Amino acid sequence: MVRFFGLNKEKNEEKENTDLPADNEQNAAETSSSNVSGNEERIDPNSRDTNPENANNDDASTTFGSSIQSSSIFSRGRMTYGTGASSSMATSEMRSHSSGHSRSKNSKNLQGFKDVGKPLRAVSFLNPVKEEESQDTQNTLDVSSSTSSTLATSGNARENSFTSRRSITLEYIHKSLSELEENLVDIMDDIHQDVISISKAVIEAIEYFKEFLPTTRDRIPYRISLEKSSSLRKINKIVLHFLDNLLVSDAFSNSRSILLRRFYFFLKKLNLITDDDLISESGVLPCLSVFCIGSHCNLPSMDKLGMILDELTKMDSSIISDQEGAFIAPILRGITPKSSILTIMFGLPNLQHEHYEMIKVLYSLFPDVHMYCVKDYIKKAASAVGSIPSHTAATIDTIAPTKFQFSPPYAVSENPLELPISMSLSTETSAKITGTLGGYLFPQTGSDEKFSQFASCSFAITCAHVVLSEKQDYPNVMVPSNVLQTSYKKVLTKESDRYPDGSVEKTAFLEEVQRIDQNLNWQKSNKFGQVVWGERAIVDHRLSDFAIIKVNSSFKCQNTLGNGLKSFPDPTLRFQNLHVKRKIFKMKPGMKVFKIGASTGYTSGELNSTKLVYWADGKLQSSEFVVASPTPLFASAGDSGAWILTKLEDRLGLGLVGMLHSYDGEQRQFGLFTPIGDILERLHAVTKIQWDIDPQLDG
């Protein structure tokens, strides 16, 4: 027979206590008001000796061992069955001994087995033992009644205990967070020291999250703040380090998904994720995103991080070398903005294994700042049009005649002499490079006769890398873009060749081609303007990349989005909110902005508080940037020159924040821009006159 808890040894040491089983039975009978409990009745189910004297000399270890086995946790139904005879005998023995022994003697004998009786009674309360009917029907009814009463009492006790566990305190939550942090820190130390494999480590981490506040299934009645909880920030960092650096291989995709989902429910339990943020019931797995560092972000280490990046931009570029377009972006990363922590994103066009090793070295630099590397790079937002897509099919069956409506892949103004901002733009001779018309600037000459010739002039502005060329010093500019129109014309011509001559489809394509030719000829006869100045250079550690175009006097220039542009997702961009009325010099971190580019159209985002540092043209540069929100796309090729705008809060209209010049070419979620204040300051330094977005008033 298998022995539990060393009971057999205990019997040999205290063999003189021969009356213990009977006294134990007497105590159980008295606590249930002289009714025999069904569980306590299991003390000696295998006894076949009806002599009470023999019962007193029975092996105590055998008695308790049988009781434990009769309520085995390995039984599927957690119920065992005994013979009616054994039950009757045990009941008879209990009644016999209860009348022949005193309560004091019973208490004395129970002290030796006090640590044994408690586990047995606990098992009895949780797992009732169902018996077969014995010959003594009355005894069976008494046992059943007593068992029901005992179970009801124990059930209420468990319910009250569960209710008390749910009433957790804030101190207990912080203690649990601290314990979880310590466990995860130990796991991460083992990983970095090659003590444990990543596969085993992530399994242990998932189990630790499962054990966090196990009695609380729903949200806690408190709100935990990342700013005030160092343990929570460190936990977030470790999880993000798993997801962004250690589990990036496709072999860990399943482990990554499980950990991310467990982390999501962990944050939801702490009220860092609300139902409005994500709907978990939809079955869609949450994902990590990047967010801007706004004005309300008070996370520790933020000031220190900004100082490091500022010092980095002041370093001598001659002693630094990196991949073209590589960058360092300070952002927030997490599932939602409220659950995100400070993050340094390293973008590299050619990502290699040693870069991940570098992250391991930098891991301990900040205790609560996440670092990760990704394949990405900064590139100019001008578009280089490639080859025209072709089809393999020779012909297409004709369809019924209908009136065709073509929609060109660029904005077209209703009035060719009134061109709104944000239209496509290129030089007259460009074959590939195209960008966006940012807007219009007007010189404020005042009464100075030296600049009187410019008093009534209008100037368009865009990025210098879009319109400057080594072949021509002062190129003419076309709006819409000559590059896009020519490319569109080639596509239509190629597509028309797939239809038979005289068909309605081919006729429609050729008519559209003819309209494009007419528009191109009109633009060459009515030139939009000519580049008069531009530069792409590093001035005071900042990129100066813009050019001004003197617009032909026959064109009416207004800083408005125009009614002829494509519809916007924002329904408030109508009427007065189509006009740019103010320059924004004081940029507030987290400010909601948008741009309308010739390539991607309307996209929105938020201003980041800390600049992005990147390597381009053999120099280390920095720039303000926008983080896309709520969609993960902000800019792409062809958007260079687009103005960064925001809706004014105190009046109707739009505010001008800056001009887009670059973006991250791989993920396209960052938009780098030059503030309008820097542009106007540089123009004043070069031209010696003031500039504004509104025409100069007479007098």
From Swiss-Prot:
Biased composition (Low complexity): 61-78, 144-154
Species whose genome carries this gene: Saccharomyces cerevisiae (strain AWRI1631) (Baker's yeast)
Membrane topology recorded in Swiss-Prot or TrEMBL: Peripheral membrane protein
Region (Disordered): 1-113, 129-158
Positions of region (Serine protease): 459-699
Protein name: SPS-sensor serine protease component SSY5
Function: Protease component of the SPS-sensor system, which regulates the expression of several amino acid-metabolizing enzymes and amino acid- and peptide-permeases in response to extracellular amino acid levels by controlling the activity of two transcription factors, STP1 and STP2. Catalyzes the activation of these transcription factors, which are synthesized as latent cytoplasmic precursors, by proteolytic removal of an N-terminal inhibitory domain containing cytoplasmic retention motifs. SSY5 binds as an inactive protease complex to STP1.
Subcellular localization, as worded in the UniProt entry: Cell membrane
Active site, per annotation: H465 (charge relay system), D545 (charge relay system), S640 (charge relay system)
Signal peptide: none
Record has Transport as a keyword: no
Any single Gene Ontology cellular-component annotation: plasma membrane
Classification lineage: Eukaryota, Fungi, Dikarya, Ascomycota, Saccharomycotina
Propeptide position ranges: 1-381
